[in-house]
Each structure stands twice: as structure tokens, then as C-alpha cells.
Amino acid sequence: MRYLITGGGTGGHIYPALSIANEIKNRHEDAEILYVGTEQGLEAKLVPREGFQFKTIRVKGMPRKINKESFIAMKELFLGLRDSKKIIEEFKPDVVIGTGGYVCGPVVYKAAKKKIPTLIHEQNAFPGMTNKILSRYVNRVMITFQESEKYFKYPEKIVLTGNPIRRDIIEIDIKKAYEDLNISPNVPLIISFGG
């Protein structure tokens, strides 16, 4: 099968997409996976490093207020729709999976309009604008938190999946991690992170 995966801008969209891609590869060695992102997004560095085929579209985030940037973003959106159509026609995916971020908007939308099975995954309790818009067109909306269900208008499409996690996080060698980070296992450690 051919899988087109898209999502980007931040690690919060990219790493779950890569987790999904890697799990597909683990379960189906013959799967063909294409990741679509933007040239300027973090995905342009991370995806090729993971060994996946990577293509780009032209698209920018839509400003919340109407201004000069809104018109530039609209132009880029139309270019992104055209780029997405071309990539979909060339790759011929069996399924398209989006993990959020403005880049997945044109890709998932074009795939849905071509009647290709489409899924989106929302990693946050409060869904992003792109996924809320796309939920109208896709076949399934996968959510991490039950609380986010109330923000989507199509409850029949929702599947609670949790958040995809990279195997290297799950299968970590704790002793080696302490050594690599030069941390004593006998000293309390506080980790703080966020997005």
C-alpha cells in the first residue's frame, strides 16, 4: 500500500507523523510512504533524516486577523492546493494521514475530494484550526484526548487512539540514558518541557 503522510511546522505535528510512518513500516515492510511538508518547516530536516521520501508544497499559515499577510497566505494556499493535487496524482496514495499544521490542509483536502481514504490525528486537547476544518472532509478523526471530541462537529468520525509515540522513547535503555546524560540514578531529577 501507498501511504501519504503530512503534518508539520512544529515537532508536535511532525513526531507523531513520523511515529505513524515508522509503525506502518514496522508492520508492513513493503509499504511505500511519502511525507509531504514545506521547505521551510522543521519537517524538511527531520523527515529525510528518518529515511522517508519527502516532497514539499507551497503554503503558509493563515493569520488570525485580516491584513497584508492574509492575502499572501491565500495565494500560497492556492499554490499549495495545486502542488498537492500534482503530488497526489503522481504518488497515487491508498490512504492519506494528516497530523495537523497548516501544511496538511491542502494535502488532506485534495485527497478527500479525490475520494481517497483520509484520516487526521489531533494530538492536543484543544484542536488546531486546520484539523477542525479538515474534520468535515475526512473519513476518520483520531484523537489523543477524549476532551477534544467536543470540538469536532462529526462525532461519528472520531476514534480515540492516544498519541503515537516513537519506539526509541518506549524502548529506551534507562541505564544507558543515565550514562549518556551524565546523570546519577540516585539523585532526584525534575524534567520540565512543553510546547
Task: Please state what every model-predicted region is.
Residues 1, 173-192:
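Nucleotide-sugar donor-binding and catalytic loop/hinge architecture
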Residues 3-7, 30-81, 161-164:
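Conserved nucleotide-sugar phosphate-binding/catalytic loop shared by glycosyltransferases and other
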Residues 83-96, 104-119, 132-136, 140:
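Glycosyltransferases and closely related glycan-assembly transferases
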Residues 72-89, 172-176:
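Glycine-rich, highly charged phosphate/nucleotide-binding loops
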Residues 5, 34, 42, 53, ...:
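Active-site-proximal region of nucleotide-activated glycan assembly enzymes
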Residues 12, 47, 100, 125, ...:
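Residue-level signature of catalytic and energy-coupling elements of molecular machines
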